[in-house]
Design a protein with these regions (language model features):
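S-adenosyl-L-methionine
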Residues: 40-65
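Conserved beta-strand signature within the Rossmann-like core of class I S-adenosyl-L-methionine
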Residues: 105-112
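A short glycine-rich, Lys/Arg-flanked "PGG" loop and its adjoining helix->strand segment in the class I
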Residues: 90-104
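Conserved SAM-binding loop
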Residues: 36
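Class I SAM-dependent methyltransferase "Motif I" SAM/SAH-binding loop
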Residues: 4-8
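Conserved SAM/SAH-binding beta-strand->alpha-helix loop
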Residues: 29
């Protein structure tokens, strides 16, 4: 399962490499889902499906507990504007939902180019997940890169990625986790404020100026 799949580059690539696995991917933008669906159809793939849906809603409404083997979230929107923190996907409540939906030993693949989001992820996933080493094939396979990763690399940004394995917990542990887990209230602009002005990339705005 991939949440926020964009144009489907990763999901389609994974479906090609793993024909025995079913792939489900969602995004809130109908335009990119149409493109992703066309991508899969052009390759004749029968093991990947795309849907217009929010990530939390998809996990909540379409899956039973213990039904997902891998959950992939790449470059979730950090929402840099003040007051938008509640829109961030990786809230403690979402992480509990993800933990419940994964099978025993299930894997949560996460990637971001935002240092503050990465720092929050590392703190927030414990004790629900144990971060493990990243597979070499994920690090090096250019065909599996998301569009956002390609753009970030072209801008010289660092890519932070991890695989977190589900830790088996008693149901009662969820309440304790939710009481103590950090809220997703980090400053997404703090690490590289020079890149953004009023929510837009400074570099792009400067290119548009007339000389």
């Amino acid at each position: 399962v991939e949440l926020g799949c964009g144009n489907g580059r990763f999901a389609v690539s994974s479906a090609v490499r793993q024909p025995g696995w079913d792939h489900l991917a969602v995004d809130i933008l109908p335009m990119v889902i149409r493109y992703a669906t066309r991508r899969g159809n052009q390759r004749g793939l029968t093991n990947v499906r795309f849907l217009v849906c929010g990530g939390s809603e998809f996990l909540r409404d379409y899956f039973a507990d213990g039904s997902i083997h891998q959950l992939h979230i790449y470059h979730p929107q950090p929402y840099r504007e003040a007051g938008d923190e509640q829109k961030r996907l990786l809230s403690p409540e979402f992480l509990v939902l993800a933990h419940r939906r994964l099978v025993a030993g299930g894997e949560f693949y996460f990637q971001t180019d935002n240092p503050a989001y990465w720092s929050y992820f590392q703190k927030a996933v414990s004790p629900l997940f144990k971060i493990t080493s990243t597979p070499d094939r994920w690090l090096e396979d250019p065909e599996g890169r998301t569009r956002r990763e390609i753009v970030a690399k072209s801008q010289g940004l660092s890519i932070f990625r991890a695989v977190a394995e589900k830790v088996e917990l008693d149901q009662s542990a969820y309440a304790t986790y939710l009481q103590n887990a950090p809220a997703a209230e980090f400053d997404a602009m703090e690490a590289h404020p020079q890149r953004f002005a009023n929510g837009h990339q400074v570099r792009r705005r400067q290119r548009g100026r007339r000389r």
